[in-house]
């Protein structure tokens, strides 16, 4: 059929526009929706049976109280940490750098005598961006009813052998794969006494100016049943802080508040990425982002990282059974109390580990989040213009802009914009949406979104 003059004119304009665009700006879109074979394989390799064996081995040390026996090979926290280190060295066949990170706590809150606090730290070095780190932890210490009781049976199967076992399983599986960024797998000590082990490591990281791009802790991820008998083995809670509770707010946080971006903190951005990735690779499993730092009256090893200014999250089961936390093992009024391994659902724990592993792999394969993202606020308009600094990755494909309604917790729309450093989203007002900018590599791996700060030209 012959073309009309209008059709011919439109086609010619499109052709001329494409030719006029520099090669770097022309959009050759990577497939961002396709599941990555490497991540799928990692998720499939996570074993509930191995997690169960790790939980039971940790329970076998009788107690892992921070001030418990350290010389025995079979009882106490010393035997537990030596076994964790040896197992990580064995399963990784030299691919992990496994070290003890230790210091002596002279005494203080919940520490009655000078005590060596020892974290087990296994690092999988990145191949192209080793200075960007993602950290995942569980705490291997345990407690009885009395937090100072260092001798009674304190199995700590769910709190937190479950998290420690999940981290060990992730480390052993992921050590057989290579990533752009580095991943640190940690079994930390003295959580029950006051987050001592994690605090020590996080402070060291800040003093060394380490680029910790994200941190997860897994604490109490072993049970799918509440004390009231409710069963939920299809979801996990992911606690993500918004505005930090500090006396002096940094300028970046003030800008978040000023622009209504309380839910666009670095931790909330990380949580969105974890939810999207985890649910993609573990079908039928839901990651529920909880807009809080942690539960009431509780705390976890992500908090020291938050206090050092890092993005950090906490995974915890949806329905806790408090009969099986911080309890001496006993039967009372016909009810079995105590944190015993028979109350751990390791199939559920394995799914939480799979969500962790998928998210970690996705993050460590992806480019870094774009830096210095700014939104033009110099005039009244119904379009939204943004600009950002260039990423340096050799395999960078370009950038993606995402947006959501101000009432939504997750991204709802997106557009690939190519390898450019500025873009205008037509017809979407910055007054009505929250925006983010992500970096995308040629394999379709996507970074965490960066929130645009207002800029007046």
Where are these regions (language model features)?
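Extracellular fibronectin type III
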Residues: 442-457
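Metal-dependent peptidase/peptidase-like ectodomains
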Residues: 188-300
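Conserved aromatic anchor
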Residues: 382-395
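N-terminal capping segment at the start of a domain
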Residues: 27-75, 324, 331-339
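Alpha-helical metal-binding/catalytic segments enriched in His/Glu/Asp
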Residues: 122, 136, 141-142, 146-195, ...
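Active-site-adjacent mobile loop/cap segments within catalytic or ligand-binding domains
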Residues: 59, 221-242, 288-367
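A non-catalytic alpha/beta surface segment that caps or lines the substrate-entry region
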Residues: 28, 50-125
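Beta-strand-rich modules
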Residues: 425-446
